[in-house]
């Protein structure tokens, strides 16, 4: 067997490799599942952060999602990318969790790494802008917010988002249009030019 196809961690780096991993998971390969888990845990965490804003809920949804991947790997038919299939599971689980979870959204400050330490004014401005964007995103309806973040933060196509959210592509286009329009209004005056 080719050493590249024998290493699950290497397979998790390409769409074709991910599909191979899902096939191996369906056959009970724990190493393949571990590789997929490691690849998707942080991606799903970032996706769900902007949806739920609850660390405990995020971890629970990610784990539930990946457990569903383990259990239902045999049902993956290859009609979409593995990422689309997994994000769709996470989206549905998050929607269910949010309906059952009636707690206020946490507006805590995120720790930002890699900020230019020599320029405190830039660091402050970056944090201010990040909070403004987060606050504006939080005001969008869940469907618009989800479509927008899948486009912006996860670089997914409208067709992939439509698969994840189980709706027509035109609905995604409309949601993105309204999200951009609303964000432009909410962020008007927030962006300042630096000298």
Report each predicted region and the residues it spans.
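Helix-turn-helix DNA-binding module
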Residues: 135-138, 142-146, 150, 154-171
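Arg/Lys-rich amphipathic alpha helix in sigma70-family domain 2
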Residues: 71-78, 88-107, 126, 178
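Short, small-hydrophobic-rich alpha-helical interface motif
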Residues: 25, 40, 44, 48, ...
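Short, charged helix-capping/linker segments at alpha-helix termini
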Residues: 3-5, 26-35, 45-64, 169, ...
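Internal acidic/polar
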Residues: 2-7, 14-18, 96, 101-130
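Sigma70-family region 2
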Residues: 26-27, 53, 63-81, 99-101
């Amino acid at each position: 067997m080719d050493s590249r196809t024998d290493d699950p961690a290497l397979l998790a780096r390409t769409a074709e490799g991910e599909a191979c991993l899902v096939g191996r998971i369906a056959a009970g390969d724990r190493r393949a599942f571990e590789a997929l888990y490691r690849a998707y845990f942080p991606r799903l965490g970032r996706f769900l952060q902007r949806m739920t804003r609850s660390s405990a809920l995020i971890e629970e949804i990610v784990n539930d999602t990946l457990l569903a991947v383990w259990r239902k790997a045999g049902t993956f038919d290859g009609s979409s990318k593995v990422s689309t299939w997994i994000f769709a599971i996470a989206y549905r689980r998050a929607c269910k969790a949010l309906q059952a979870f009636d707690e206020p959204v946490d507006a805590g400050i995120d720790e930002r790494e890699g900020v230019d330490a020599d320029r405190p004014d830039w660091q402050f401005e970056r944090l201010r802008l990040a909070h403004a964007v987060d606050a504006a995103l939080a005001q969008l309806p869940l469907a618009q917010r989800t479509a927008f973040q899948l486009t912006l933060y996860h670089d997914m196509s409208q067709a992939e988002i439509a698969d994840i959210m189980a709706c027509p592509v035109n609905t995604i286009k409309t949601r993105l249009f309204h999200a951009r329009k609303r964000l432009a209004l909410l962020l008007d005056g927030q962006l300042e030019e630096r000298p």
